[in-house]
């Protein structure tokens, strides 16, 4: 996928629609206990995007959450149907995490890593072709160089604008 192609997504009822103006930086499946409780599922798949590339239409509400790591975040939901659309993690400066399965074509963005597999359901088998991490990983080691460069460039521009 080209970097400048638009990607669309929505909540279940269609009241919240969004567009991502660049391809995601990285997609991962999280098996931590918090994500399981929050989603009512065995894991969640998130696609990390630069904050300035997500354009949301429709009314969302948010809830402050604290991850198992202690990191704070805000989860954004459709006010009508409650679909959890994206998250803003305090620790992910300049990035937002879109719920990959809310994309129109989520299969274009399969997980590039599985994290917190220490909490993975024992009956769930994972692909041997995808990196698995007991807990979290270091993005500087795991993410593609192109994604790391995009983040670095964006944060540099953002810093220059704020000065």
What annotation goes with each model-predicted range?
Residues 1-10, 15-163:
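A short Gly-Trp-Pro
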């Amino acid at each position: 996928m080209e970097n400048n192609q638009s990607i669309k997504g929505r909540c279940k009822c269609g009241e919240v629609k969004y567009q991502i103006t660049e391809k995601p930086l990285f997609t991962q499946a999280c098996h931590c206990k918090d994500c399981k409780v929050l989603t009512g599922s065995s894991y969640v798949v998130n696609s990390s995007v630069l904050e300035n590339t997500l354009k949301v239409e429709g009314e969302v509400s948010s809830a402050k959450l604290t991850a198992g790591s202690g990191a704070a975040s805000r989860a954004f939901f459709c006010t009508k149907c409650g679909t959890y659309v994206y998250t803003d993690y305090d620790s992910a400066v300049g990035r937002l995490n879109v719920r990959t399965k809310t994309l129109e074509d989520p299969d274009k963005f399969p997980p590039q890593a599985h994290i917190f597999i220490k909490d993975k359901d024992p009956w769930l088998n994972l692909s041997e072709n995808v990196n698995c991490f007991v807990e979290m990983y270091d993005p500087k080691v795991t993410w593609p160089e192109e994604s790391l460069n995009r983040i670095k460039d964006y944060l540099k521009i953002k810093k220059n604008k704020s000065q």
